[in-house]
Amino acid sequence: HDALPIWKLYISEIPEQEIIMQEQFSTKELKKFATQIRMEICKMIATIPAGHLGGSLSIADCLAVLYGGRLKHNPEDPKWDERDWLVMSKGHRGPALYPTLALRGFFPVEMLATINKPGTDLPSHCDRNHTPGIDMTTGSLGQGAGTACGVALGLKIDGRQNKVFLIFGDGEIQEGQV
């Protein structure tokens, strides 16, 4: 019979909440995850009259790597104090982040069909007050870098080990704030 992966040998010593964070996808699993993200992006964009398909598709690999084991997160507790932060500065790339969060269990995948519809929790731009797993409300380009630095500094001052990841676009560099 197959040997247990080394991390499973220590599973009884790790609190259940920590196990969620330690899952690491293999390269094959990351490719599959990125493909699933892209498929869900295409389905979502097809249901709304507008959207940034190219930009959303272009960050699927990055999101797959982050949510496939690099970024500490807990879908059952999206505001978990020990989580790492993701600042999606280019908020119009929400159609990439939403499927990523849904596929990781932050909310049901069926909810993706409600993007940008009245009363939805999935507005066209990321909104931390509506969508589980969103760390920063975005809209205006160029503000994410400063916000990410501020969050990282605040965490450091508090003596916390959380990491802060930033995704921003080339157009933001032209905004004069980066």
Residue locations for each model-derived region?
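Short, small-residue-biased leader/transition segments that mark boundaries at the very start
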Residues: H1-L4
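Intrinsic disorder/low-complexity segments
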Residues: E16-I19
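N-terminal hydrophobic or amphipathic helices/low-complexity stretches enriched
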Residues: M21-I37
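N-terminal capping segment at the start of a domain
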Residues: A34-A50
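Cofactor-binding active-site loop characterized by glycine-rich and histidine/acidic residues
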Residues: I41-M44, S56-V178
